[in-house]
């Protein structure tokens, strides 16, 4: 087990839960199993394709840890003397852009009338970034992360921001970002931490 200082990032596809719920067609007996299977396969394919797009874009800068349902968790150990945070922020911008392009291209290329394909345009991307201490443990060849920073970033997901597409940074991250960037400050209690959050 190793204690490290670094960055944790969660890229979360918003609109995923209602998207999946809408396509659980087996709950509607009149639809039939064949149509239900068809719709479910397209819903799964869309989400998997978008998650692959997110991972592919982030991996040059951060290490992919694991999928958490509709979200991907990344980490990066801090290196002294390097401005890693700016590189992460730049990658967040390009990943959001490529995610939206991928959503639009999937909808256009497939030209499919099924509900999952038609509703895919409602899928958006939220990203959360925090800096702190975390533990890294290898269990059966998998790198498992734990610790206070990991708890904190997951608490960041539970906020009152109404938008379905945004970046959310902790104060620890903001200290290292370009001072010329303009952010909106939101003060919100994070359970067991009581820290304010910054979002753009």
Where are these regions (language model features)?
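Short acidic-hydrophobic surface loop/beta-edge motif
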Residues: 188-196
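Catalytic NTP-binding/metal-coordinating core of nucleotidyl cyclase/transferase enzymes
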Residues: 1-90, 94
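Conserved small/polar residues in nucleotide/adenosyl-binding loops
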Residues: 198-200
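Catalytic beta-strand-to-alpha-helix segment of the class III nucleotidyl cyclase homology domain
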Residues: 79-189
């Amino acid at each position: 087990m190793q204690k490290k200082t670094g960055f944790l990032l969660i890229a979360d596809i918003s609109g995923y839960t209602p998207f999946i719920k809408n396509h659980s067609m087996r709950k509607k007996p009149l639809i039939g199993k064949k149509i239900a299977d068809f719709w479910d396969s397209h819903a799964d394919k869309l989400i998997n394709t978008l998650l692959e797009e997110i991972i592919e874009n982030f991996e040059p800068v951060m290490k992919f840890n694991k999928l958490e349902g509709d979200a991907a968790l990344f980490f990066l150990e801090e290196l002294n003397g390097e401005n890693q945070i700016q590189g992460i922020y730049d990658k967040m911008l390009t990943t959001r852009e490529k995610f939206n392009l991928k959503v639009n291209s999937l909808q256009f290329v497939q030209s499919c009338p099924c509900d999952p394909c038609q509703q895919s345009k409602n899928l958006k991307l939220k990203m959360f970034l925090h800096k702190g201490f975390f533990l890294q443990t290898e269990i059966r060849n998998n790198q498992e992360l734990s610790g206070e920073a990991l708890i904190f970033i997951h608490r960041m997901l539970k906020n009152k921001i109404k938008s379905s597409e945004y970046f959310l940074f902790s104060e620890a991250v903001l200290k290292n970002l370009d001072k010329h960037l303009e952010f909106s400050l939101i003060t919100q209690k994070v359970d067991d931490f009581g820290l304010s959050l910054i979002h753009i």
